[in-house]
Amino acid sequence: MPTRAILFAVAVLMVTSTATARAQKTELKWGPAPPSLPSGARMAVISGNPAAPGPFTIRLRLPSGFTVPPHFHPVDEHQTLISGRIGHGMGDRVDVRAVKWLRPGQSITLPANSHHYVKTRGRTLVEVSAVGPFTVTYANAKDDPRKR
């Protein structure tokens, strides 16, 4: 009887690992980032919907030298750097000397309504999680790409 139980457990583990492997092979669907971000950014939705109520996770591909001018969100924003370099600064104007750079695997949480800006070095892939609806409000209206 113990042999049958062991064989059953092994079979269950094999089926589970096959299903997991299939789920991880799903290709992300990349498209342009929302118009609230400067041009050049690409976005893929991992889960949820940033425009709807509830949790969501997205990935952003950002070109080298990309800058998101000072802005804020009504909710906490959680970022995990996957590749490249991403830097964050706080305040209503960009100060490159004040930027704190993340390395791949590092994370940052930007509190709701905190004014911050983002810069990249090299092609950058970052995962962003928050609760929607997620909005971007620029500290300086002239920086808003939707108004150009």
Regions inferred by a protein language model and the residue ranges of each:
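Bacterial N-terminal signal peptides that target proteins for export
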Residues: 1-8
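Bacterial N-terminal signal peptides
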Residues: 8-17
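A short, N-terminal "cap"/entry segment at the start of jelly-roll beta-barrel domains
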Residues: 19-58, 141-148
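N-terminal post-signal-peptidase region of extra-cytosolic proteins
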Residues: 43-47, 58-66, 70, 95
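Short acidic-glycine-tyrosine-enriched beta hairpin
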Residues: 49-51, 63, 86, 92-113
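Glycine- and acidic-residue-biased ligand/ion/polar-headgroup-sensing regions
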Residues: 63-66, 73-93
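Short beta-strand His + acidic residue motifs that chelate non-heme Fe in jelly-roll/DSBH
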Residues: 68-70, 88-89, 110, 115-121
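Double-stranded beta-helix
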Residues: 97, 119-148
